[in-house]
Amino acid sequence: MVLGPGIGSPVRRGSMDYMLMLINKEMPVAPPLKHGIVDVRDVAKMHVAALENDTSIGKRMIVTENTYWVKELCEMLNKHGHQAPTFTPPVFLVKFLANFDKTIKPIKPLLGVDVNFNTETARSVLGYDPVPIEQTIRDTSDFLASYEKG
């Protein structure tokens, strides 16, 4: 999931829409999902670093600050004045509901999966040093709040 401050107004799709859904309580619970989070500024820096570094040719780089459960993201948002959901229903219950709710069905295989990523290649080849998640969440929150205030 790519987060961080944007340029212009946020578009209601992808990661920003997901965060707005949490902030606006359009998602009543924190689903039992774990996401890799990367700051958009890190994505830009790593693109430039890869273009300037011949060692990166032919290599795939994973850039993610770390992985976080949705509940953890909600708790970080709440530290910035939001009231995002912090209750996570049991995996079996959400999987059962996925049989009847077409919005949940696509994520059914990911529910409760403890995903992790290895960023060692990006760190060693490109010097990847990610923006801390707390800063990314704060800056995302501030960006979305400034847009909502007009």
Where are each of the predicted segments found?
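Mid/C-terminal beta-alpha module of Rossmann-like enzyme folds, strongest
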Residues: 46-105, 133, 137-150
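Ca2+-coordinating acidic residues in Ca2+-binding motifs
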Residues: 42, 72, 121
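Residues that recognize and position ribonucleotide moieties
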Residues: 36, 87, 115
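Conserved C-terminal active-site "lid" loop/helix of NAD(P)H-dependent oxidoreductases
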Residues: 97-129
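Residue-level signal for the nucleotide or nucleotide-sugar donor/cofactor binding architecture
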Residues: 38-41, 68, 131
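A conserved pocket-lining segment of Rossmann-fold NAD(P)-dependent short-chain dehydrogenase/reductase
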Residues: 2, 8-9, 16-38, 42
